[in-house]
Amino acid sequence: MTAVLPEVLVLGAGVSGLTTAVCLAEAGFPVRILAELLPHETTSFCAGAIWSPYLVSHPHVDRWSAQTLKELVGLTGDGRTGVRMVTGIEAGRTPVEPPEWATKVTDFRLCTGDELPDGFVSGWRYTVPVIDMPQYLSYLSERLSTAGGTIDKGRADALDPAPITVNCTGYEARALVPDTGIEPVRGQLVVAENPGVAEFFAEHDHDSPAPTYYLPQGGHIVLGGSAEPGRVDRTPDPAVSAAIVARCAAVEPRLRGVRITGDRVGIRPTRPTVRVEHVRENGRHVIHNYGHGGAGVSLSWGCAREVTDIVGAIDL
């Protein structure tokens, strides 16, 4: 590596782009984010979110998710971050086994029958980070600024505008790369005042177009969700929101008649496998970091650390 660290351009200001930029800046690299959507406009802003590395494929997923879990747990003591450790239940309407990652987290145990909501026959309890994404993205933005990084609003029409570019554009990578392997999955959730719910709930049915979950985040609670492949509009659908509230209230009666404060809609960038890869484009270096589906938060720090290692090994 040269004595003076080269500037790195990060494309995308969602959780993957911000986390990657933070890691690079704190490692000493001059970093600039260029993003068509600022953090509060991204799909990441619309996420629930909970650490749950589900429906993602890559040989390094276990390592990335474990690294991210460690980072998030370390942030729970800082009230600025929006990260809290929350206990809850994941349950299935049919007999299901817990994923291996769930068995390794804090307080894991199988549920007894009387702990399960009506209509559910299997489940498990555990404690994991739940993340208030608007607050968390603000924290990451401030952390980036403190480390000397900047965020500019703008659109990249090519992958190689700088000697080193990190592509964290999510669904937009479909056109930018181009990568037709990326498929959009529209997700919608509801934000409401929290009537006193302290534990999360998540339905274990990854094939459902309407997965039921709720995530308490202090004074408010996030209710979900939906999964609509191929749909890319981000206008909230009132019928979807009403169905979400009804399903969540069937699990937790205190959510009946809850006061709704907003809706969020995002486009998950699903792909057969996560792409974290270093390639050369027109003599310049491009490091891809996209295709995380609904697990962008859960893999964010692990992928960002790997990108930082890749950049650190480049000799210009």
Where are these regions (language model features)?
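Glycine-rich FAD pyrophosphate-binding loop
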Residues: 26-45
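Glycine-rich FAD cofactor-binding loop and adjacent beta-loop-alpha segment at the N-terminus
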Residues: 45-73
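Short beta-strand to alpha-helix junction loop
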Residues: 59-67, 123-139, 235-240, 299
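Flavin (FAD/FMN) cofactor-binding and adjacent substrate-gating region
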Residues: 70-148, 271
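A conserved short coil-to-beta-strand element within the FAD-binding core of flavoproteins
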Residues: 149-161
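Flavin-dependent oxidoreductases
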Residues: 162-246, 251-259
